[in-house]
């Protein structure tokens, strides 16, 4: 029997991980979706090694549950995984529970990121200060594991199609 697959979507804030992840989920029968932000939703927000490790553990717990569910065929995880040790922990944890993995890092130009950022009126943390943080992180994300996907000039649907084509090759 073929193992279930988890598709990890990584990238800076505003790259389109959640939007693309939801589109992938809707395109694959029996696909679950995990937004890593749900797994460390603290108020006020605290992003440090302790909370990142907790979120990774929460993601792995959810992956194990979906892996044991007969109705689930695969999972998409969208999260900002900016530390190699977090990527490693998720990769190793997924392997331990018998999941195949596919990693994609969504990247874009600074201009595309800014345009998307300013167009998202619903997200309360789309501030100019956070945009600067996201722009500064672009280069670091290009060095992390995963198939790089330059989403500049692409719609979310085109990014989804690109990823699904890559998975079918």
Across the structure, where does each feature detected by a protein language model lie?
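Pre-Walker A (Motif I) flank of P-loop NTPase domains
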Residues: 2-6, 72-73
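Hydrophobic anchor at the beta1->P-loop junction of P-loop NTPases
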Residues: 9
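Walker A (P-loop) phosphate-binding loop of P-loop NTPases
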Residues: 14
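Conserved lysine of the Walker
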Residues: 17
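Conserved substrate/cofactor phosphate-moiety recognition/catalytic segment
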Residues: 21-64
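Glycine-rich phosphate-binding loop used to anchor ATP phosphates in small-molecule kinases
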Residues: 54-98
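Conserved phosphate-donor/acceptor-positioning beta-strand/loop module used by diverse small-molecule
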Residues: 97-117, 149
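Small-molecule kinase domains that catalyze NTP-dependent phosphoryl transfer to phosphate-bearing small molecules
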Residues: 119-162
């Amino acid at each position: 029997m073929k193992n279930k697959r988890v598709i990890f979507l990584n990238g800076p804030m505003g790259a389109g991980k959640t939007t693309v992840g939801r589109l992938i989920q809707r395109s694959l029968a029996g696909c679950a979706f995990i937004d890593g932000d749900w797994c460390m939703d603290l108020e006020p927000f605290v992003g440090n090694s302790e909370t990142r490790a907790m979120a990774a553990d929460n993601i792995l717990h959810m992956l194990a549950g979906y892996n044991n569910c007969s109705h689930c065929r695969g999972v998409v995880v969208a999260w900002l995984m900016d530390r190699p040790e977090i990527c490693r922990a998720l990769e190793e944890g997924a392997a331990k529970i018998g999941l195949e993995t596919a990693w994609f890092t969504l990247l874009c130009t600074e201009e595309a990121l800014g345009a998307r950022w300013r167009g998202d009126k619903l997200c309360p943390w789309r501030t100019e200060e956070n945009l600067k943080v996201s722009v500064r992180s672009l280069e670091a994300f290009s060095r992390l594991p995963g198939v790089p996907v330059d989403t500049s000039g692409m719609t979310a649907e085109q990014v989804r199609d690109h990823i699904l084509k890559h998975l079918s090759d």
